[in-house]
C-alpha cells in the first residue's frame, strides 16, 4: 500500500500555538489543550477548525491503551506540547486521527526523562493512502466500535454510582463525623493495620517481571478493585520470609503515600504480597465487620481520610493515623444486606465487562487491519 507523509497530507500549524502558564490564564469557556487532552478552560481561542492534535512531549508514547493523538473541533487554544495538524483536501480528519492514535513511535521519540516527538520527525511519519470513500468507511466502522466501548464504560460507571447511592441510603455519608456517635469505632479496634517495613523491602525484595507472587503496589489499587495490568513479582520463598506482609482473602489495601486513599480488596490466598506505600488492613473479627462493607466505607470517605494527611515533602498517612480512623459501624446483618446488593450488581457488571472486552477486541483488530 502507498503511504503518505504527514508533511504532504497535512497543514502543520505548530507556529500558531501559544503556551500560557497557569498563573497567566484567564478563565473562560474555551478548552486549553496539551499533549493528552484538555488542561484548562480559557477566555480566548487561537483555532476554530477541525484538527488533530498529536503529542509532542509528555505524550503516551508506546501505550497500547492511551492514544498519542486526538481530535478537536471548534474554538480552542493549544499549548506547545501538542503538534497541530489540519488535513488537506482528500484526507478525512477522523481517518487522520485514527491513523495516529496508536502510532508506533519506537525510534522516533527522544529524551530520557520526558520523551519528545520533534516536528522534523513528525513530518516524516507515514499513514496509509486511501481514497476518501475508503477512509470514511473505515471511520464509520471504527466509530461504531468506539461508541459501543463508550456506552459499556458509561454503563459500568452508572453501576458504580448505583452501589454508592445504595451505600449512602443505608448508612449515610461516611464523611459526616457528627452522626451515630454511639456506633463509632476506631479502625484499630476492629482491624490489624500494618505495612511492609523499609528495611524488609531493602533486604528481601527483588522485583521480577515474572514469578509466583504478585507484589501489590499503589498503582494496583483502584476503586476497591485490584488492577493487574502492570505488576511485579517475587518468589514464594521470599514471601514466606515476610509473614506480616503476606496477603489473604478479605484483606483491604490502602495507599498511604503519594496518592493517598486508593483501596482494593484481596480476592485470593497465596497469590499476593504487600509492596511499599500500601497499608494492609485485616479484619480481626469478620462476625462484626464485612470486608465488602469496609472497602466501600473507605472508598466513599475520601474527604475524611484526607483530613489525616501530613503535608510534608510527600503527602502521607502513617499506620497509627489509619488505626485512628473512626466510623459508625452498622450491624453485621445490615452489612451483609449491602454485600448481597453488591453481589447482584457485580453479576450485571461481569456481563457488561465481557461486552466491553469484546468491543475493545473488535476495535483493536480493526485498527491493526487498517493501520498495522
State the predicted function of each range.
Residues 18-22, 39-45, 52, 59-76, ...:
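Short, ligand-facing micro-motifs at secondary-structure edges
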Residues 90-95, 287-292, 336:
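Short, conserved charged micro-motifs
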Residues 75-81, 96, 112-133, 256, ...:
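A short glycine-rich beta-alpha junction/loop motif
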Residues 84, 272-293:
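Short peripheral tails and domain-boundary helices/loops at the edges of structured domains
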Residues 7-53, 63-68, 188-205, 219-249:
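Sequence-specific dsDNA recognition surfaces
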Residues 1-17, 22-34, 124-140, 151-198, ...:
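Non-catalytic DNA-recognition/assembly elements of restriction-modification systems
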